């Protein structure tokens, strides 16, 4: 019996060559709409779907293939005589292959100003139905959804090398594809922030050599609706491929540097900033970030919110760095940095910061945690002075900078800063006093310590942190407040005559 293949594709890539190969193998081709016209234009013999169903297309093409003569031909089990007898009695011929890719819903909703009505018209109904029918019956029907598979499938057909394993792989690919397609539609139509069913779909962006450690396998996936301002939306223009750890650190650095309005540089190591600097120029900001911790910056990830110029590039070129990510690189800056073949240079559109993710999701055993991104930002207008001593205008500026930095540091987090650079960062300690000692210990070695302030990501459970800070020259502190022992910390600050402000906003980061 002549084999039959049903072709209905929105992506015509490779279609005619594949169809010619099928005809050469004595396949009878069935097709619909634009696919049929494309085949006819290439002088490839094809019959219309209405000749199979005996029913014309209707509702502006919304109903074409939703017919028993199509789906019975796909779903009938060839190994069950009763199924084949029913086909014969109904005058239905089996269909042995389905070649379908779906309406371009994703491309449609990514167009600017697309209306919901336009998007809905690109929700494919018949295509997924045919693919799922074929994939369910993959033992007898080849379900093909990806033009990239045409060449290999044709070669296997020509050599009679279509294996059960290949059939199962193609079926799995179909169900992955249709599940992702439906998830994208659900994602588009859902207005709830935390729906009862969370349907997200991701596409494999790249394979990674390994994960966090060399014995761990890993890959990098991108949201099917990626944001322009993100590490996935960044463009790598030089250097070796990104690693798992590179991606995490670059993401953290990019999120942080995007919060600053004036020229800023963030140096990131192991998901913690090791140096942050602000300046009137990007070179000045670099100098401050570098001076903040010239040891830890070695092998770091650098994020800048201004184009990289030659002067800044020359200074960065003198160091071993993993990644530099910025809006752009001046030609002469790129030329000098590109001399390091392994240094990864990346660009991202800072005009698109408004598109950054509003939610973040992390995996836990057996599930996910989803929350709003911590976009809170406290300014001096949000501060409440709780001590007798009032902070000076200069201290208020420094407190605001410290508060903005500390929320990006792993808890327990304490930072010591001036108004435009970090001096010491204490991160990830199990108690706040240890973080305080680390931050102050680093800061005391820095120029400008006499103007330093201290910021804490959460309240002080006891007054020991305030006492230690005061004894080591800190003159102003910002912290959320809210401890049952706040009065003890405030009294300690008053005892030493230092200013303290509270924000009412905690910034834990795990």
Swiss-Prot record:
Cited SUPFAM superfamilies: Cytidine deaminase-like, Methylglyoxal synthase-like
Annotated EC: 2.1.2.3, 3.5.4.10
PANTHER family found in the cross-reference section: BIFUNCTIONAL PURINE BIOSYNTHESIS PROTEIN ATIC, BIFUNCTIONAL PURINE BIOSYNTHESIS PROTEIN PURH
Gene: purH
Organism: Lactiplantibacillus plantarum (strain ATCC BAA-793 / NCIMB 8826 / WCFS1) (Lactobacillus plantarum)
InterPro entries membership: AICAR_Tfase_dup_dom_sf, Cytidine_deaminase-like, MGS-like_dom, MGS-like_dom_sf, PurH-like
GO cellular-component term (any): cytosol
A biological process term (GO) from this entry: 'de novo' IMP biosynthetic process
Protein family: Belongs to the PurH family.
Catalytic activity: (6R)-10-formyltetrahydrofolate + 5-amino-1-(5-phospho-beta-D-ribosyl)imidazole-4-carboxamide = 5-formamido-1-(5-phospho-D-ribosyl)imidazole-4-carboxamide + (6S)-5,6,7,8-tetrahydrofolate; IMP + H2O = 5-formamido-1-(5-phospho-D-ribosyl)imidazole-4-carboxamide
GO molecular function: IMP cyclohydrolase activity; phosphoribosylaminoimidazolecarboxamide formyltransferase activity
Protein name: Bifunctional purine biosynthesis protein PurH
Pathway assigned to this chain's UniProt record: Purine metabolism; IMP biosynthesis via de novo pathway; 5-formamido-1-(5-phospho-D-ribosyl)imidazole-4-carboxamide from 5-amino-1-(5-phospho-D-ribosyl)imidazole-4-carboxamide (10-formyl THF route): step 1/1; Purine metabolism; IMP biosynthesis via de novo pathway; IMP from 5-formamido-1-(5-phospho-D-ribosyl)imidazole-4-carboxamide: step 1/1
Comment field on protein domains: The IMP cyclohydrolase activity resides in the N-terminal region.
